[in-house]
A protein has these predicted regions:
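Short, Lys/Arg-rich flexible segments
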Residues: 1-76, 81-83, 87-155
Length: 155
């Protein structure tokens, strides 16, 4: 008596696609947590003198899937500062613009994590060994690598 399958090749494909989507959602959710941790680190762990609040307000992240933004971190305007305008509005708007500009240039298919400091002088502050995104970048790389190993390890 032969054994007959009670499923089709289409059933197998559908099940595989479900599993892929489940893992994709898990990956995106983990990236959101990582993004929030890195954002918190970047905004609170800096050593530079925050004069206007713009640099701190220009820091943000997003997650893209196939070139489309599926989630963007909250843009908080900080009013910490030692002089001048201290509302962080300029930083926040430049951060959003820079993040969206970079996201539009992404040609990578799949899931992409982007984190930016949108003020034009951020690289100069980094060059003076004052942490803007360095520590957050290292944290993100470490956590994303650990997450990939955890989510996609073979049993």
């Amino acid at each position: 008596m032969p054994i007959k399958p009670n499923f089709t090749a289409a059933d197998i494909r559908a099940r595989m696609n479900q599993e892929i989507e489940r893992r994709k959602r898990g990956l995106i959710t983990q990236l959101l947590y990582i993004g929030e941790e890195c954002l918190k680190q970047a905004r609170s762990g800096h050593k530079y003198l925050n004069q206007t609040g713009n640099l701190c307000s220009s820091i943000g992240y997003c997650v893209l899937v196939d070139g489309e933004i599926v989630h963007e971190g909250e843009w908080k305007q900080t009013s910490e500062g030692k002089g001048g305008e201290k509302d962080g509005k300029t930083g926040s708007s430049q951060g959003v613009a820079f993040l969206h500009e970079l996201a539009a240039k992404q040609t990578t298919q799949g899931i992409v994590f982007l984190m930016v400091a949108g003020m034009p002088y951020a690289q100069y502050v980094e060059a003076m060994s004052l942490d803007v995104l360095d520590t957050s970048e290292q944290m993100a790389e470490r956590k994303i690598k650990a997450m990939r190993n955890r989510l996609f390890k073979t049993k």
